[in-house]
């Protein structure tokens, strides 16, 4: 099977040199993504499209799923390639493929052609369309809005019959734009804003300000890992965690109640600017939307930006909450966000919506900035690919096993798409399907007299979720490894 990758239209209108660079980067990204999962694939770059050849038929659904989640791809054509010798040969190949699909249907033929031939694209459309109309009695030609569009691509002495068209993610390939640092809290907004910059071609690193202990950090790591694993595995990214509990304590003790929200955000962008400068990252990304909460008025946002040494970007600035939640649902972060508490909103009871700069500066004069510097100096840096290993060191260890007892139930915590693609079937073992993002709300409703062995394909999410449940006080959880 062969896939033809069509590029995001904005790439095609670039100058020749820029377009060539973008296509080269996208080809490299596709290789990186696919080769993490299978070696039975070939990727070939062309002038205005990319070919992907699947060598093993069983891996076609996996390859297609990965391509649909790769930024820079407008759409994917699933095609069958075959040689031809004449115009009639093209018709015969097309008839063999479509004779059953066109019964009692309206259809039209659309042809794209490259190379030197004795016929034009219109000649092929007329010949093949007329032949199909004659051979299939119940079929009828309809040039506008037909039931079936027969698509044929001709290149030299080969023809491609398009079996299916799949929409891609769009956007620019990761690496065509400069890196950004996303301030991720685990809520709806920060996850969506991170995704939007990934789709726009930036490599997104993550900076997390821990206000709620180990369980809060585990939850945010789950979201960051989920976004990375679905949309940006072509690139290595960093996860930076800064313990901000001491900073919050200093603010609570020394800053006027009404100014706390703005001061906290200013401390965050100060710290993030230092991290960004260290790694030559050009901008900070936040999930703020205009007027959504008290600190997100134009006056307050301007004062927050004044504390930053880096450019602050807000892709959601005009988005409604309803639209943000819909996007979170689309990318699979909504259920994680639902279980995440909003710590920033609880430190100020009467927040100002129109902070005065002189007042903010005065309040920050009471703040001991050594506390902030110490928090930044003690930040932890993690390659997101090693997130499970680092978590094991930081939090209570979780037992992993492949042996089962009568009290053991396996919890398949993969996403519904992964479950459908590779169902987990084990002889003499009860398997319950419960996606990882529902564990925080539904685990308590399970029979707690049983032991639950959490399973995911790579073991990353199962370890994180087991650690999260241990933090919540559940001792009847382990990680399940498939027997070899």
From Swiss-Prot:
An example Pfam family from this entry, by short name, is Rhodanese
Q: Where in the cell is it found?
A: Cytoplasm
User: Which CDD domains is this protein grouped with?
Assistant: PPase_ThiI, RHOD, THUMP_ThiI
Does the entry annotate any disulfide bonds, and if so which pairs? 344-456
Q: Where are the transmembrane segments?
A: none
Question: Under which EC number(s) is this enzyme classified?
Answer: 2.8.1.4
Q: Which residues bind ATP?
A: 183-184, 265, 287, 296
Q: Which residues form the THUMP domain?
A: 61-165
Active-site residues from the entry: 456
Q: What is this protein called?
A: tRNA sulfurtransferase
Q: Which organism is it from?
A: Haemophilus ducreyi (strain 35000HP / ATCC 700724)
Question: Which gene codes for it?
Answer: thiI
């Amino acid at each position: 099977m062969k896939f033809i990758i069509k590029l995001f239209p904005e790439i095609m209108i670039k100058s020749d040199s820029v377009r060539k660079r973008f296509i080269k980067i996208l080809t490299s990204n596709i290789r990186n993504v696919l080769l993490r999962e299978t070696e039975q694939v070939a990727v070939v770059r062309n002038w205005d499209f990319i070919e992907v050849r699947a060598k093993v038929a069983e891996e076609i659904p996996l390859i297609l799923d990965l391509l649909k989640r790769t930024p820079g791809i407008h759409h994917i054509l699933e095609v069958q390639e075959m040689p031809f010798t004449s115009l009639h040969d093209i018709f015969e190949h097309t008839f063999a493929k479509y004779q059953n699909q066109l019964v009692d249907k309206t259809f039209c033929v659309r042809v794209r052609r490259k190379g030197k031939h004795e016929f034009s694209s219109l000649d092929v459309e007329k010949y093949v369309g007329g032949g199909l109309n004659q051979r299939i009695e119940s079929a009828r030609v309809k040039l506008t809005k037909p039931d079936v569009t027969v698509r044929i691509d001709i290149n030299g002495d080969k023809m491609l019959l398009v079996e299916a068209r799949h929409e891609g993610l769009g956007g620019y390939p990761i690496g065509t734009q400069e890196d950004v640092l996303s301030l991720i809290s685990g809520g709806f907004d920060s996850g969506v804003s991170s995704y939007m910059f990934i789709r726009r071609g930036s490599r997104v690193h993550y900076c997390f300000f821990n206000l709620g202990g180990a369980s809060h950090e585990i939850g945010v790591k789950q979201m960051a890992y989920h976004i990375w694993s679905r949309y940006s595995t072509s690139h290595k990214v960093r996860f930076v965690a800064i313990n901000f509990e001491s900073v919050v304590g200093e603010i609570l003790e020394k800053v006027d109640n009404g100014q706390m929200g703005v001061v906290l955000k200013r401390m965050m962008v100060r710290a993030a600017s230092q991290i960004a400068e260290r790694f030559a990252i050009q901008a900070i990304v936040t999930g703020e939307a205009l007027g959504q909460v008290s600190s997100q008025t134009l006056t307050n946002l301007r004062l927050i930006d004044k504390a930053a040494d880096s450019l602050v970007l807000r892709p959601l600035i005009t988005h409604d909450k309803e639209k943000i939640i819909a996007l979170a649902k689309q990318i699979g972060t909504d259920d994680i966000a639902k279980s995440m508490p909003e710590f920033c909103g609880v430190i100020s009871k009467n927040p100002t919506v129109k902070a005065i700069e002189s007042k903010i500066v005065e309040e920050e004069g009471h703040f001991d900035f050594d506390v902030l510097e110490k928090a930044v100096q003690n930040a932890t840096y993690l390659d997101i690919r090693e997130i499970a290993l680092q978590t094991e060191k930081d939090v209570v260890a979780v037992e992993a096993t492949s042996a089962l007892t009568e009290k053991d139930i396996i919890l398949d915590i993969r996403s519904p798409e992964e479950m459908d693609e590779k169902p987990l079937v084990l002889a003499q073992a009860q398997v319950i399907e419960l996606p990882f993002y529902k564990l925080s709300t539904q685990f308590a409703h399970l029979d707690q007299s049983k032991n639950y062995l959490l399973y995911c394909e790579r073991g990353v999410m199962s370890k994180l979720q087991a650690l999260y449940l241990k933090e919540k006080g559940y001792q009847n959880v382990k990680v399940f490894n498939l027997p070899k």
